[in-house]
Amino acid sequence: MNAKKRKGSAVERNIVGKLRDKGFAVVRAPASGSKRKDPIPDIIALKSGVIILIEMKSRKDKEGKIYVRREQAEGIMEFARKSGGTLFLGVKKPGVLKFIPFDKLRRTETGNYVADSEIEGLDLEDLVRLVEAKVSKTLDNFL
């Protein structure tokens, strides 16, 4: 495994560990470089019936754009549709880790997807709060 893939794998493992610590059931399912024919997101996290799907991308520089190839994007969007999960692009740049809802990505003329630096994302704590808000039950749920 080359250094770039090792670093990306380390980021994914770190996120998996943090989500587990927050009570999620988590699977790391990296497919890049493998012989898998069916595209799947890098991280699948579940908590009380809520499914979060994360495709991770990293950059060495803070300002560069993050691209997802059309074929990969279509495959993981189909996985999200079939699973009922919410798909995020996890972006790791120097000093930055954010999770962008996939539907906020911009589509290029060639059909690829791109995350500009200006696109707002959630940090890990905000992502956890989003899920916990979906699973929290109030008295109104039982009336």
UniProtKB/Swiss-Prot annotation:
It comes from the Archaea. It is an enzyme of class 3 (hydrolase). Mg(2+) binds at residues 12, 42, 55. Disulfide bonds: none annotated. Binds 1 Mg(2+) ion per subunit. It holds the Pfam family Hjc. Its cofactor is Mg(2+). The keyword DNA repair applies. Disruption phenotype: Not essential, it can be disrupted. Gene3D superfamilies: 3.40.1350.10. One of its GO terms (molecular function) is DNA binding. The record marks 57 as: Transition state stabilizer. The active site is at 32. GO terms for biological process: DNA recombination; DNA repair. Keywords: DNA damage, DNA recombination, DNA repair, DNA-binding, Endonuclease, Hydrolase, Magnesium, Metal-binding, Nuclease. Its EC number is 3.1.21.10. It catalyses: Endonucleolytic cleavage at a junction such as a reciprocal single-stranded crossover between two homologous DNA duplexes (Holliday junction). Belongs to the Holliday junction resolvase Hjc family. Homodimer. A structure-specific endonuclease that resolves Holliday junction (HJ) intermediates during genetic recombination. Cleaves 4-way DNA junctions introducing paired nicks in opposing strands, leaving a 5'-terminal phosphate and a 3'-terminal hydroxyl group that are subsequently ligated to produce recombinant products. NCBIfam families: Hol_resolv_Hjc (NF040854). This is Crossover junction endodeoxyribonuclease Hjc. The gene is hjc.
